[in-house]
Amino acid sequence: MAGPCCSPWVKLLLLAAMLSASLPGDLANRCKKAQVKSCTECIRVDKSCAYCTDELFKERRCNTQAELLAAGCRGESILVMESSLEITENTQIDTSLHRSQVSPQGLQVRLRPGEERSFVFQVFEPLESPVDLYILMDFSNSMSDDLDNLKQMGQNLAKILRQLTSDYTIGFGKFVDKVSVPQTDMRPEKLKEPWPNSDPPFSFKNVISLTENVEEFWNKLQGERISGNLDAPEGGFDAILQTAVCTRDIGWRADSTHLLVFSTESAFHYEADGANVLAGIMNRNDEKCHLDASGAYTQYKTQDYPSVPTLVRLLAKHNIIPIFAVTNYSYSYYEKLHKYFPVSSLGVLQEDSSNIVELLEEAFYRIRSNLDIRALDSPRGLRTEVTSDTLQKTETGSFHIKRGEVGTYNVHLRAVEDIDGTHVCQLAKEDQGGNIHLKPSFSDGLRMDASVICDVCPCELQKEVRSARCHFRGDFMCGHCVCNEGWSGKTCNCSTGSLSDTQPCLREGEDKPCSGHGECQCGRCVCYGEGRYEGHFCEYDNFQCPRTSGFLCNDRGRCSMGECVCEPGWTGRSCDCPLSNATCIDSNGGICNGRGYCECGRCHCNQQSLYTDTTCEINYSAIRLGLCEDLRSCVQCQAWGTGEKKGRACDDCPFKVKMVDELKKAEEVVEYCSFRDEDDDCTYSYNVEGDGSPGPNSTVLVHKKKDCPPGSFWWLIPLLIFLLLLLALLLLLCWKYCACCKACLGLLPCCNRGHMVGFKEDHYMLRENLMASDHLDTPMLRSGNLKGRDTVRWKITNNVQRPGFATHAASTSPTELVPYGLSLRLGRLCTENLMKPGTRECDQLRQEVEENLNEVYRQVSGAHKLQQTKFRQQPNTGKKQDHTIVDTVLLAPRSAKQMLLKLTEKQVEQGSFHELKVAPGYYTVTAEQDARGMVEFQEGVELVDVRVPLFIRPEDDDEKQLLVEAIDVPVGTATLGRRLVNITIIKEQASGVVSFEQPEYSVSRGDQVARIPVIRHILDNGKSQVSYSTQDNTAHGHRDYVPVEGELLFHPGETWKELQVKLLELQEVDSLLRGRQVRRFQVQLSNPKFGARLGQPSTTTVILGEHDETDRSLINQTLSSPPPPHGDLGAPQNPNAKAAGSRKIHFNWLPPPGKPMGYRVKYWIQGDSESEAHLLDSKVPSVELTNLYPYCDYEMKVCAYGAQGEGPYSSLVSCRTHQEVPSEPGRLAFNVVSSTVTQLSWAEPAETNGEITAYEVCYGLVNEDNRPIGPMKKVLVDNPKNRMLLIENLRESQPYRYTVKARNGAGWGPEREAIINLATQPKRPMSIPIIPDIPIVDAQGGEDYENFLMYSDDVLRSPASSQRPSVSDDTGCGWKFEPLLGEELDLRRVTWRLPPELIPRLSASSGRSDEDGSVAGGVEGEGSGWIRGATPRPPGEHLVNGRMDFAYPGSANSLHRMTAANVAYGTHLSPHLSHRVLSTSSTLTRDYHSLTRTEHSHSGTLPRDYSTLTSLSSQDSRGAVGVPDTPTRLVFSALGPTSLKVSWQEPQCDRMLLGYSVEYQLLNGGEMHRLNIPNPGQTSVVVEDLLPNHSYVFRVRAQSQEGWGREREGVITIESQVHPQSPLCPLPGSAFTLSTPSAPGPLVFTALSPDSLQLSWERPRRPNGDILGYLVTCEMAQGGAPARTFRVDGDNPESRLTVPGLSENVPYKFKVQARTTEGFGPEREGIITIESQVGGPFPQLGSHSGLFQNPVQSEFSSVTSTHSTTTEPFLMDGLTLGTQRLEAGGSLTRHVTQEFVTRTLTASGSLSTHMDQQFFQT
């Protein structure tokens, strides 16, 4: 091996390492300001700090080396700790060897804290390397056919391996799951043979170790048989870990590429997922090999599954690369998993594994091109980063490499200064250094001996103890004395206890030495504060000089000896006066306009006026705004003796008026004024001259004559009334005796005996340049009786103004292909994803639509396949406006129009196109010049829109006519009223003509991008817009080029744009199949807007050539046209904007030619309309924009103005302000899992002020006074979307303090704090604990989990669509249910006789089920039984902040609470049971309702398309005999801002009542107050001393001799105005109310599908400002995924939002806030669950899909029984929300409380809808 100094490469490496060492910057302040007492402390302050040991040196000894030399310290006396980097082993890379190599192999480096060194690292991967392939296969029963296929494809796999490498080995292992409950059926017969012809269950077995003998491999594989287990997830993680660590048993070779193929179709178990708790397996995996002689895993019964971080670390350590071959059923789980492995592959395995060979080949080539380099075993004090100047990184951090070449990488090694506030040199030795293994994916790597320099200064080891130089009172070391206690001074000659020494330091009249600002040392003051205090007695404070605007010395000077020393050009006591008079120069270049003098940078005018500006010039804009109005009253009283100053007040006017015959013209005077005299309605006029400030001797000229209107018109009123009565009489006679008038009058509701349909308007006038679309929605009305259904056929004809146009169009070639537009209404609801092209839902539906429609239109001769299929919604279409409209285009011959129309109408009448369901009564067929269609009026619908195409073409006339005609009513009894609608489209003068430069371009594929110029000829300078799209010819999209479409917008003055089309390389297959054919495609312009017209050519052809055959003619050329003339001034040149901070932008430019008087700057937020721009005037060519938003993009431009007016604006410039630290995060929320485990979540800061990059969570113990105990632990959450953390192993019954702060590019923001003790929180029902999809922190453990995400409980569900579930065929016969509560959770007490996925999860209020399927514990009978429940404690989420965080009115805490759900379960789980469904619910009567949609497949009375909602309530709310029922009504009446009257009705009871109990407390926690009322006749109570604007929960219950009854609960808030300084004190006499007027109305949820719902709400009654829109937040109620936000614009009475992409059976929390001009208002909150159980273990129960809501609070209770009951919600005495009758017999009811809408769908299929009167709380 060559020595490290002999190689030129090593010299280059050392030179690069020396150059890369970070140089000291301007950090002298840091070294100087550090309060260090020794050399060692100084050296550790910063990497650039040095220490002077010169005894004669008198300055500060700790400084940078350069500063010390400059201050006079000798070079040999300066002590500096130098870092070092030395290569200890370096063997040159030999590319002829067929193995992976690195260089260098050994390195030793020592770094100072904060220092970074870099070096070059080389890695070589050969073209062909040895490969070890180990196949690990799932052997559960569902993989039986996969095993059979693997046995048959031996030759193919061997062939592929030989193609990959000549040196390979192959092995095989199998796994199922742990042989324990509940994973495996433990019955003896099932342990012997779980399936026919199968092996006993096992965990993992190494069947065939890695071998070169392929024949032996296949012979052993033939004898393998399948096995089985119970649950769907498998135990593959155990198998992967054993395969990695058992290197000798598996047979991994040292210098080969290790590939592990993991084949399964199921999800996986992982550490602490809860399954092992049931079997008592609690120990963590020890990460060791545990295989016996037969290769079987032996510790499956004693150790848990490994975690994801463990597998990632161990596979990387042993150079093993995983290849996940999984089926579609489990693809989503492994798609998340494989991203955590630096180098891995994921492929979709077919159901029978027939494609495993192809998948393996593809994965091998993908893996070979990626290389990951990681630093293993790195100590905490060192950070390693690997970069490359030539190689690209992937999203997982690996590099794209080329095999056979040496890759060069830059390794950056940095020593950190501190960790969590502790200096690195104070950490343990193992954290300061160690052996770092820099390891590539396929080789051993580089060993680095790295450490942080924490040595003690040598001079401190050589100190003179009790030195004579220190008067024997101290030690001399490092050039100075370190005095003993009680002595000070440079030579320790001053006694700190001697009073006489302080006398020279006492100022006259003071008793403190050095004025209390310093220390007296040997008769001399040494001032504190590092320069803050000065003077002989430290009497001057340099922070107490005069300030201006808060700045010391106006930031224009420095404070010295108590006075400001100003910078040049400034003067004054606080440096606030400029010496220059530049700010006093007027627009003419003079000083103060000659009417004043300049002092301290300001003009002092000789004569002050309201209309003079800062330079004593006349402000004409101010004159125009107020002058006329100021003079009006005086002119009116002096000239005419009228007005408000008539009489004596007129004598006070400061001027006189003069009546003249004629006034001067407006342009000759300052202002021409005109007003109306209120006394006689006449108009008088007068002029104002001069400077606009008439003085005592001034005269105002007034016109002598007034302009008066003609005589009075009051006599016309009786005449008009008479004429109107006569007209009404004539209309009545016409209707009676004239038949022709009946049709017209029939359109009026008052005159119609039947019902009619007709268009609302008869004429529309449109301007083409203002049109935003090529269609028009024309309303059609139905009058009279709205019962029944009517359909109307219509047609529209284009260009009716041209005689014979239709005949000419028909005479063209009948075989020519023309596009026909088709629109149909599908039988499914529309979602937002459907309207977004490219989403999976949209693509799936598009494929389904095109397949079915193509099948139908095959009957049309010459028809092509459908294209341009899109989906949308159409409003105003009756009751089906939420359904999906599909628009598509069909190419067919011109002669096929009639056949196409008849075929479409026939299929629409049938309600289907092949297998595609469509809604009858709606279609549109659009031809070249006409269109036909049909619309439908459903029952009760009065208005629908008819969407007609407008046939916008470039060749249209300047004024063209279209005619819309209602043809007939094929279905229904309506007669046609207004049948015709005329549409006139006026084409304005075009603002520009847009076209291509050339009709054809030739480009080379080697250019990768075709750049096609588009030009505009400006006719009228304004905006122009056109659409563009590519079309295939001989070139095909996605094969030769990437298709594009979009819109081009030309701003004023723009004449040139460029289209870019990405070109694709020609594949060999294409060149062989398609030969040498010239490939071309077209780019087409269309749909001009904003007055644009298409010129010629509007279509261009792009010819693709190869690299050596193209004569490229596509020239990128910027065309520009001179701007139109604007006066004598041009546009300012070279505008430049630069951010000057987070809220400032400096904008400057070069002046244009000419003499501008000033500049006008226009700026606005990018994306806003220019009409919302702000304007600034400037006299100089620069301006500073202030009061901006942080991290916001602004656009700006500037123009000059002069005497001729404004010139043209400059080009647009954009600039982004800097980031500012974010505000504190939103409120902290705690989901208490147990007394030692909590889930912490928080909201994003209200003001992010930039891009949030991370959050820091700190938590630590506090005492009873909330003071910290010990250090706080910090957790960095570097994914800003993940605002959730699971903290485990907290101490029992100990309060913790939690803080969360956010970071953006500007730094860390303030903290949000909360203190909570988990033990004091209420217990909640729990299921098996499943680790959510969030970071997990062990409060007592290390940091193993901090950088990895775990998986949620969805991995435990088997695929719903799987036809072969991997479970046993025995489902058991019953179960045992035991409630599991809080910290009493002990899963070892629980046993199941069913698989976990078949066990229903019941809430605490639902009782438990026995083996027979009936409800136990208080159940009486089958149909009318009741279940006894308990009253839960207040939810813990109201204590989310750990302090009394009172809720404002309308917040989530004031209106919403969580309640238990009503659950319906089947009576048995066997596949052969009856269809009996038993509904259960809690007996606790609450003021909340749950919403559930239920569908039974066996009933047949309701179609599946109906989304109905069922409100399930207690069937019998009565309890035991003699116990009072719940008080039936709870009514609140506000008596004042702090007092409330609570009333209720006497409950039903079989015994005599003894009294009542009223309890109340703050909704978000606090002291519980209780009032006992012994008088049973008293049903009201007055509560005093409530807090204003705070929500209270009240509970009322009655008592009899048998005990207390159930309670009635209600929540109320008294709103009132409070004192600004004391928010708990209401203002005397202020109004008070019980409403929440600034929150949105109640949230109403409607299920659309199992994964989407529709949310609607009403606008706030009294919003704070004008409503701009709403912000809707959707998040999982229990956490697990980042929150989603939606913006809904507009101010509608009722707003709606469709939310797709939800999960079934998962509770979601929705929050709605109104966004107003004053900001965001309070939230309205609701919790909802879409419940769905389709197939799975309950195939006989059909489909159960609906909504479960923890809904809004309201005074409402209902009982559903077989008879009609009345439900009356009350808000206060005498005001009811209305009465609802709920019919329980065969009806499904959707009910929303408070302000509510009730819809009832009966079993017979008829639908009735009514809207109750809506009330708000008052």
Swiss-Prot record:
Spans traversing the lipid bilayer: 713-733
Compartments, record wording: Cell membrane; Cell junction, Hemidesmosome
Sites where the protein binds Ca(2+) 1: 142, 145-146, 351
UniProt signal peptide: 1-28
Domain PSI: from-to ranges: 30-74
Main location: membrane
Residue ranges of the region described as Involved in NRG1- and IGF1-binding: 195-200
All residue ranges annotated as the I-EGF domain in the record: 459-493, 494-539, 540-576, 577-617
Keyword Thylakoid attached: no
Name used for this protein in its record: Integrin beta-4
